[in-house]
């Protein structure tokens, strides 16, 4: 049994929850994620010794493009996710993971522009189900933008692209009352 404490910044407040999960290394249990039939969320099925626990991650849509954010806590980092063509991983300074990154994708061939607000990016991973093509990506954290040019994606294949900032410029967490 693994006790995982998940912490997230939600609406300006730090939220902490506890997930009790089977130890995947001991029992071979796997956390599986799938898109719900109504396409409103990605649901994680987490095996525990008292049954399957479910967690939902919001699934957003911009036209025909779907995307969701994940990677907070051990459960989300070890899950098996649906095949979205692009996975962006955000890091900064000495922090292995950052969130709140605003992302703009451009397809130079036809001028398509998609903008994903930082508020939708609550974890260090951003999964985007893009149509086949070559894209330019701009990722902005704390006013500093990183560029990735000529990234080619194909449906059915996952491209993982790491985006790193030299310094951590993510917003400060709210002070906690004593």
Role assignments for model-derived ranges:
Residues 133-140:
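A short tyrosine-centered beta-strand micro-motif
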Residues 25-105, 144-178:
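Primarily secretory-pathway and cell-envelope proteins
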Residues 116, 126, 149-152:
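Beta-strand-rich interaction surfaces with strong enrichment in secreted/lumenal proteins
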Residues 8-19:
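Bacterial N-terminal signal peptides
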Residues 131-132, 155:
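Surface-exposed loops/turns
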Residues 1-4:
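Positively charged n-region of N-terminal signal peptides that target proteins for export
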Residues 109-123:
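Short, acidic Ser/Thr/Gly-rich low-complexity loop/linker segments typical of extracellular
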Residues 123-129:
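Short, surface-exposed beta-strand/beta-hairpin micro-motifs centered on an aromatic residue
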């Amino acid at each position: 049994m693994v006790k995982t404490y998940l912490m997230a910044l939600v609406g300006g407040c730090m939220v902490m929850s506890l997930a009790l999960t089977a130890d995947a290394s001991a029992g071979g249990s796997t956390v599986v994620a799938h898109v719900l039939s109504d396409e409103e969320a990605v649901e994680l099925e987490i095996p525990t010794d008292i049954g399957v626990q479910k967690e939902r991650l919001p699934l957003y849509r911009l036209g025909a493009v779907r995307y969701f954010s994940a990677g907070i806590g051990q459960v989300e980092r070890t899950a098996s996710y649906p095949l979205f063509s692009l996975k962006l991983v955000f890091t900064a300074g000495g922090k292995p993971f950052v969130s709140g990154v605003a992302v703009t994708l451009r397809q130079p061939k036809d001028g398509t522009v998609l903008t994903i607000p930082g508020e939708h990016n609550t974890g260090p991973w951003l999964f985007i189900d893009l149509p086949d093509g070559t894209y330019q990506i701009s990722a902005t954290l704390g006013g500093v933008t990183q560029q990735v040019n000529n990234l080619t994606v194909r449906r059915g294949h996952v491209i993982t692209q790491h985006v790193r900032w030299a310094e951590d410029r993510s917003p400060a967490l709210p002070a906690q009352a004593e």
